[in-house]
Each structure stands twice: as C-alpha cells, then as structure tokens.
Amino acid sequence: MRRKGLLPLVVLLMTVCLGSNVFAQGQPTVHAVQSVANQTTTVEGSLKDGVKLKSLAWAAMSSNACFPATQNAKFTGNHVFFVTDLPPHSIMTVTVKPKNGSTDLSIYGYQIAPNIVVLPEDLRSCVTCEADHKWDYPKRGQTQTSARSIRFNAIGNSYKIFIGVAGANGLTEGDFTLEVTLKQ
C-alpha cells in the first residue's frame, strides 16, 4: 500500500474544505442585519463572540485601501462580523457604540458584489472600504466620542456591505450596539 501520496491529497482536501484561512478560534459567524429604507436598524454584539484575524495585510492592499498598516494596532483584538444589503440609490451609515464608553472599538466595512460574502482575509478587491478608529491626534474643530462610523453610497447598483467591529490593542471583551441607517 502506498501511503506516501496520501498526505498531499489530505492537505488539498483540507484546503478546499476550510478555505485559505484558518482563524485562531475556528470559522467566524457572520451576522445578517436586515436594513430597512429610511430607518435605523439596531443590533447588539460582543467582542467575546468574535475571532482574531491571523493577518491584517488585506486591509492595506491598494485594491482594498481600508486602513494603512500603521493603524493595525487598532484592529488587533477580536473581530465580530455583520453583513447587510445596500440597494441602489441609497446611502448607508454604520455606527458602533460601546456599552462602556472606555471600550476602544474600531469599525471597518467594505462594499462588494451583492451575491457573495467574502471574509476579510480572503478579500482581494472591493468597490470601496471604509474604516474608523480612535484618532492618534486631535483634529481641529472636531471632538471624537467612543462611537465610530462609516458610510457607503450606491448609485445605480445594489451591493453587499460586510462590516467588521474590532477591538483595539488586542481587546477581546466589550459589548456594543451596531446601528445601520439606510437612506433612500
């Protein structure tokens, strides 16, 4: 019996079944959020239910341009994932608010084709990617709160919006409220 050739086959099958990513805590859950025209949908979440990503390199790729690698520390905690639909001729604002104002959260989201869901580490390109996190320095005329917001705009096509709420500086615990406001 020839066992030598079995290992490459097993590795190939594991790669096909698991995908290209193996998350530290297993495959993540992606929570569906039903956005409603001209309303705000609110969902509760917790970083405890999230996973740490092996790599943040996808975010700084020029085809994604989500956030620069100099800001990676703000996304090193657990990530909790959400997905919603963005219909044509609409603007969506997504805001995360920590239950405890001292919890340092970050948010990112990307706009992709309406018929797919792509996890962050598998993202090779997107229509647009937005992120918000704690500022390194004050901005003239602006005051930052613990809330973080991102915004998307659809002109003639519908899109899928993938949202990630992340703990900053390795944070793995913290409850939050996610608000999805859709204007048509």
List where the protein language model places each region.
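Generic cytosolic/nucleocytoplasmic N-terminal low-complexity/intrinsically disordered segments
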Residues: 3, 20, 37, 47, ...
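Bacterial N-terminal signal peptides that target proteins for export
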Residues: 1-10
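N-terminal leader/pro-regions and domain N-caps
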Residues: 28-49
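Bacterial N-terminal signal peptides
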Residues: 9-21
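Acidic, Ser/Thr/Pro-rich low-complexity intrinsically disordered segments
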Residues: 25-28, 35-37, 55-184
